[in-house]
C-alpha cells in the first residue's frame, strides 16, 4: 500500500487548504489517535463530505471502504483506486480481491476507514435525526483480523442543504441503486466538530461465536459514538 499511501497524502496535501477554507473544522480527542499499527476507524456518515473532513483531521493514511457503485463515478473512481480505496457491495458482500486489499492494509499496519451506517442515513435524508442502524461488517473485520477500533463522529455546527447535483436519471444510468437515485438533498458543511473517542480493544470480543461477537462489538461501537455526540465536546 506504499504507493497508495503516497498518492493519498499528495491528494490530501493538495485538497486540505481548500477544505480548510470552505469548512471551519475543530478536532477533539486527537490524543486518542494511535500513531501507528493496524486500526479500524469508524465514523457516522451524513454527507459526501465526510471522508474529506475526517481525512483533514486524521494524521495517518486511511484506506477507505467505499460502496462499490461509487467506483463507477468518473474521476472519483480513478482517485479512489490510486489512493487505496476498497470497494464493498451495499448488501455486505465483498470480493476476494477486496478482502485481500483489506488484509494488506492490516499487514502494513495501516488504518482502514469505514462508515458503519453505509449510505442509509443519506437515503433517509432527515438531517435532524440521529444515527441509523449499523451494518456489522466492520466488526467482522476487527474480530477476524484482531484489529482495534477507533470510534469518531462528525457533528455539524453550521450546514446548508442543496439538491444532489447529479439528476436521478443520470445516477440510474451510472448504475447507482434505486434508493440512491431517489436521494433529494445533500448536506454541505460550513462548520463542524470532529471528535475521536478512546480505542476499543478487539480482545474483549473473542470468546463467543463470531455472530454474537459481531453484534456485541457493533453495539458497543455505536453506543460509544452516540456518547461522543452527546459528551463533553458536544457543546464545545
Residue ranges of model-derived segments:
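Helix-to-loop junction immediately C-terminal to a conserved catalytic motif
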Residues: 8, 13-45
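Short, basic, glycine/proline-bearing loop/turn elements
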Residues: 15, 82-90, 122-126
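Short gly/ser/thr-rich secondary-structure transition/capping motifs
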Residues: 20-28, 93-96, 175-179
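Catalytic core of membrane glycerolipid acyltransferases/transacylases, capturing the structured
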Residues: 35-93
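Hydrophobic/aromatic ligand-binding patch that stacks against planar heteroaromatic rings
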Residues: 54, 79, 104, 140-144
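A cross-family acyltransferase "interaction/gating" segment
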Residues: 126-208
Amino acid at each position: 500500500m506504499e504507493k497508495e499511501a503516497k498518492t493519498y497524502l499528495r491528494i490530501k496535501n493538495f485538497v486540505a487548504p481548500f477544505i480548510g477554507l470552505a469548512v471551519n473544522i475543530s478536532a477533539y480527542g486527537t490524543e486518542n489517535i494511535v500513531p501507528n499499527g493496524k486500526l479500524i476507524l469508524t465514523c457516522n456518515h451524513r454527507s459526501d463530505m465526510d471522508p474529506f473532513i475526517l481525512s483533514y483531521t486524521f494524521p495517518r493514511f486511511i484506506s477507505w471502504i467505499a460502496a462499490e457503485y461509487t467506483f463507477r463515478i468518473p474521476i472519483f473512481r480513478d482517485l479512489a483506486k490510486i489512493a487505496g480505496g476498497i470497494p464493498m457491495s451495499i448488501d455486505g458482500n465483498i470480493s476476494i480481491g477486496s478482502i485481500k486489499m483489506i488484509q494488506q492494509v492490516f499487514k502494513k499496519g495501516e488504518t482502514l476507514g469505514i462508515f458503519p451506517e453505509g449510505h442509509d442515513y443519506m437515503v433517509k435524508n432527515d438531517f435532524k435525526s440521529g444515527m441509523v442502524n449499523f451494518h456489522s461488517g466492520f466488526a467482522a473485520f476487527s474480530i477476524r483480523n484482531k484489529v482495534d477500533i477507533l470510534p469518531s463522529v462528525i457533528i455539524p455546527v453550521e450546514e446548508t442543504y442543496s439538491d444532489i447535483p447529479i439528476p436521478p436519471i443520470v445516477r440510474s444510468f451510472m448504475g447507482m441503486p434505486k434508493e440512491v437515485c431517489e436521494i433529494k438533498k445533500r448536506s454541505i458543511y460550513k462548520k463542524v466538530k470532529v471528535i475521536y473517542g478512546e480505542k476499543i480493544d478487539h480482545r474483549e470480543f473473542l470468546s463467543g461465536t463470531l455472530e454474537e461477537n459481531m453484534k456485541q462489538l457493533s453495539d458497543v461501537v455505536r453506543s460509544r459514538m452516540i456518547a461522543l455526540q452527546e459528551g463533553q465536546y458536544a457543546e464545545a
